[in-house]
C-alpha cells in the first residue's frame, strides 16, 4: 500500500509538472502569428480565378493633375502613424493622384490583430490644390512611406517608399532616392508589350520598441500572375532588404523578370552628352555588375541608345548582380540640385540556387532624365507551371560602398571613357581617323602590388561588326592601376558593336571582364 500510495503521488506530481510545462510552452509561443503563408494563400486563390482589373475611384480633377500639383498634397507630419507608439519607425501615406488612381489597402499587424489603416482626408494638407472636400471623403491611399532616424537621432527621414505598380525605393544613411526595385517584371521589352504587376494590399508589422527592422508583406496581382511578398527592411549605413516571394502564374508569360531593378542613364563619360552640358554625367546608375555562378565578374557600362537594346548574360545560379553608381566624387556629376553622387547602387544577392537562367539588361532611349530607361533582372530558363508556386529569396543592398561589390582578389573598372579615335602625326598634331576610342581604367589592390614594369597584357575580343586597330595597356601612375586603350573601327554604324576585355599577367586573370556595347548609330 505504501508503495502504491507513493507511486500514485509521484504520478500526480508528474502530471502537475507536465501541465505547468504545457502552460508555459503555450504562453511562450503566440497562439496566432501572421506570415507570408497567409498572403500566399490569397495569392494562390487569386491565380486560380480570372483577373479583375482594379477600378479607379479618383475624381477627374485629381486624375488629370500635373506632377507639380500632386507634389503639393502633403501628409501632415503630426498625423504620422505610430507617432504615439514606442518605436523609431513611423508611417506616412501617399494620396491618390495622377496615374496613382487606384487605392491600395494597407493593414497594421500586431501580435493579435490585423486592422486596416483607414484613409481620412484629415491626414493630408492639400495646399493650393482646389478641390471639393466631398470628392475625397471616400478615396484611399496610393501607397506609403517609412520614416526612421537614419541620419540624426532626433530627425526622422524617409527611408522606404512604396508607390505605383510594384515599385519601391530604399535609401541608407547619407543617401537620396535614385534607382527603384520592383516586385516582378513580365514580358519586359517584348513586342507584345510589358505587363506591370501591382501591389494591391500591404500588411505592415508594428515593430517592438527595440526593433531595428521593419517587416512588410504585400499581395501582388496582374493579368497573368499573383504573388506574396515579405520584405524585411534593415536601415543603416547601407540599408538592406531581405525579400521572400511566392509567385503563381495565372497564364503563360513570355518572360519573367525576377528581382527587377529600374534606373536612369542619360549620358556619361562612356557616352558623352550630344549637347553641351556642364555635367560630366547624368545618371542614377552607370553600369551593370554581375557575379556569375562560375565566379566571373562582369562590368557592363550603361548606354542611352537610339533604339531599344536588350543584352543577355547566361548565368546559372548567380551569386549577385546589380545596377551600380561607380564614382562617388561630386566632380563626376557637378549637380547641386539632384546630387547623383549620393544615389545608391542596388545589388541583388540571391539566396539558395536559382538554377539556369539569364541576367538581362534593357536599355530604352530617353531624351531627358525624367524617364527610367534602364531595367535589369534575372529570368529563369524554365518558367513555373501555371498555378505552381515559384519560391525565391534574395537580399537587396542599397549602398554607396561599391568597393565591397566586387572580388577583393581582382581589379575592377574604375571608369570607361569614349571619344573619337585619332592618330598623332609627325608634326605631333592628333588627326581623327574615323575610329572610336575607349579608355578603360582598371584599379584594385592586386594591381597596386605589381611593379609598374610587370608584363600586364590584355585579352580583347570584338564582335563581327568591328575590328580592333589599337590595343594598348600601360601603367597609370595616378591610380596605381593599368589603363587599356582601344581603337575600334565599326563596319556598319547602323548595327551595335560588342566587345570584351580583361587584363592578365601570364596565366593569371587580374581584372573583372569589361563587357561593352557601342550602340547603333552613334
Swiss-Prot record:
Q: What does this protein do?
A: Involved in the biosynthesis of osmoregulated periplasmic glucans (OPGs).
The protein here is known as Glucans biosynthesis protein G
Q: Where in the cell is it found?
A: Periplasm
Which terms are listed as keywords in the entry?
Periplasm, Signal
Q: Which cysteines are joined by disulfide bonds?
A: none
- The signal peptide annotation in the UniProt record is 1-33
Its GO CC terms are: outer membrane-bounded periplasmic space
- Keyword set includes DNA damage: no
Amino acid at each position: 500500500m505504501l508503495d502504491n500510495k507513493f507511486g500514485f503521488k509521484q504520478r500526480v506530481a508528474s502530471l502537475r509538472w507536465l501541465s505547468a510545462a504545457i502552460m508555459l510552452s503555450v504562453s511562450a509561443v503566440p497562439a496566432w502569428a501572421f506570415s507570408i503563408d497567409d498572403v500566399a494563400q490569397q495569392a494562390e486563390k487569386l491565380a486560380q480565378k480570372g483577373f479583375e482589373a482594379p477600378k479607379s475611384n479618383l475624381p477627374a480633377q485629381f486624375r488629370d493633375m500635373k506632377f507639380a500639383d500632386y507634389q503639393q498634397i502633403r501628409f501632415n507630419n503630426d498625423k504620422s502613424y505610430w507617432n504615439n507608439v514606442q518605436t523609431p519607425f513611423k508611417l506616412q501615406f501617399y494620396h491618390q493622384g495622377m496615374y496613382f488612381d487606384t487605392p491600395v489597402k494597407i493593414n497594421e499587424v500586431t501580435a493579435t490583430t490585423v486592422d486596416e489603416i483607414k484613409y481620412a482626408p484629415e491626414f493630408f494638407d492639400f495646399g493650393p490644390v482646389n478641390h471639393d472636400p466631398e470628392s475625397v471623403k471616400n478615396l484611399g491611399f496610393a501607397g506609403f512611406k517609412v520614416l526612421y532616424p537614419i541620419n540624426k537621432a532626433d530627425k526622422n527621414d524617409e527611408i522606404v517608399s512604396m508607390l505605383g505598380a510594384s515599385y519601391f525605393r530604399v535609401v541608407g544613411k547619407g543617401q537620396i532616392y535614385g534607382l527603384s526595385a520592383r516586385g516582378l517584371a513580365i514580358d519586359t521589352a517584348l513586342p507584345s508589350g510589358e505587363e506591370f504587376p501591382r501591389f494591391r494590399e500591404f500588411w505592415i508589422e508594428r515593430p517592438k520598441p527595440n526593433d531595428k527592422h521593419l517587416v512588410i508583406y504585400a499581395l501582388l496581382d496582374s493579368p497573368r500572375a499573383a504573388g506574396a511578398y515579405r520584405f524585411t527592411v534593415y536601415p543603416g549605413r547601407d540599408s538592406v532588404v531581405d525579400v521572400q516571394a511566392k509567385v503563381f502564374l495565372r497564364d503563360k508569360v513570355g518572360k519573367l523578370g525576377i528581382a527587377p531593378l529600374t534606373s536612369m542613364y542619360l549620358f556619361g563619360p562612356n557616352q558623352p552628352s550630344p549637347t553641351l552640358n556642364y555635367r560630366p554625367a547624368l545618371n542614377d546608375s552607370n553600369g551593370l555588375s554581375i557575379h556569375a555562378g562560375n565566379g566571373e565578374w562582369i562590368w557592363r557600362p550603361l548606354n542611352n541608345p537610339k533604339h531599344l537594346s536588350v543584352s543577355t548574360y547566361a548565368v546559372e545560379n548567380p551569386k549577385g548582380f546589380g545596377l551600380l553608381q561607380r564614382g562617388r566624387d561630386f566632380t563626376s556629376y557637378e549637380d547641386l540640385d539632384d546630387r547623383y553622387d549620393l544615389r545608391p547602387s542596388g545589388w541583388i544577392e540571391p539566396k539558395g540556387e536559382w538554377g539556369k537562367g539569364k541576367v538581362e539588361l534593357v536599355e530604352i532611349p530617353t531624351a531627358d532624365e525624367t524617364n527610367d530607361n534602364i531595367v535589369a533582372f534575372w529570368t529563369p530558363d524554365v518558367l513555373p507551371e501555371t498555378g505552381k508556386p515559384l519560391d525565391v529569396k534574395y537580399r537587396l543592398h542599397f549602398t554607396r560602398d561599391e568597393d565591397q561589390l566586387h572580388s577583393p582578389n581582382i581589379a575592377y573598372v574604375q571608369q570607361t571613357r569614349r571619344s573619337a579615335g585619332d592618330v598623332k602625326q609627325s608634326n605631333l598634331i592628333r588627326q581623327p581617323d574615323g575610329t572610336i576610342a575607349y579608355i578603360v581604367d582598371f584599379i584594385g589592390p592586386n594591381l597596386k602590388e605589381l611593379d609598374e614594369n610587370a608584363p600586364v597584357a590584355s585579352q580583347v575580343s570584338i564582335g563581327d561588326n568591328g575590328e580592333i586597330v589599337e590595343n594598348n595597356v600601360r601603367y597609370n601612375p595616378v591610380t596605381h592601376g593599368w589603363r587599356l586603350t582601344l581603337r575600334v573601327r565599326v563596319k556598319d554604324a547602323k548595327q551595335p558593336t560588342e566587345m570584351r576585355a580583361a587584363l592578365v599577367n601570364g596565366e593569371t586573370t587580374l581584372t573583372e571582364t569589361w563587357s561593352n556595347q557601342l550602340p547603333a548609330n552613334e
